[in-house]
Amino acid sequence: PGWSVLPAQVSLYPHFLIHISVNQNGEKAPENSMLYMASLQSKGGHVCGGFLISEDFVMTAAHCQVNLTRVVLGTHNIKNVDEGKIRYIEKMYKHESYQNVGTGKDIMLLKVTELNNKLQTIPLPRSEIHLGDNTKCYVAGWGFIKTGGGVVNELRVVDVSVINPRVCREMWGGVPDNVICAGGYKTKKGFCQGDSGGPLVCDGTAVGIVSFNWEKNCNYPDKPNVYTDVSKYLPWIKTILKRTKRSE
């Protein structure tokens, strides 16, 4: 299939990686909103998005495990980052069954160094969820705002609607288990290169993780954007969080 997950620095990584950039036809996020958003960075700058779920854990996509060195939190502008917004990655917990975006389980937790200041977190679903067709949600990130563009410095956000799973499977010719489809189909709204790993937020809850779109093209109205369904991995998430608490 033509799914693609390209990191922001496309030329540096294998063609099958999909680091998506939210905000095909999005707008700048309001100041002081969504401060749970994380910019996952390598020495070359922004690679993927993520989101803070506890004081020392960031959730992102498994396919974002590409030379990551640090996480920037609590800011909209990633150009001139205050040292107090930077956390370093202590350990990565990629889902043990992850192979590639096409087979699913595209989820990863990052244990990050703790800082003194408390930062905003975003809640996860409490139990397994089933979103209704056309549920309005939004996705945010620092990714490209058009095909072939570049990473943006200011966080951008776009609203997207949930797509019926059957329609999504038909349009893709099959998708992995445990995913949510929203945006990118019969609309110009959706994510693009550089947004991978960021959250799909519905009613204030992080229900999905940006996983893949169609090839390197964000200007397509015929392939739904695909997200990992966080609610299907709650037992795995709880196991990781408990394990690290015990070892401290």
Regions found by a protein language model. Give the residues of each.
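Protease-domain processing segments flanking chymotrypsin-fold serine proteases, especially trypsin-like
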Residues: 1-59, 69-75, 80-84, 239, ...
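Conserved, non-catalytic sequence blocks in retroelement Pol enzymes and Pol-derived host proteins
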Residues: 25-31, 98-102, 129, 148-151, ...
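Extracellular trypsin-like serine protease catalytic domains
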Residues: 37-41, 138-248
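Conserved H-D interstitial segment of serine endopeptidase catalytic domains
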Residues: 40, 58-100, 117, 158, ...
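A structural micro-motif recognizing beta-strand termini
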Residues: 41-44, 111-116, 126, 183-186
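Conserved active-site neighborhood of the chymotrypsin/trypsin-like protease fold
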Residues: 58-61, 103-127, 154-157
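Active-site substrate-binding loop(s) of clan PA
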Residues: 96-99, 114-152
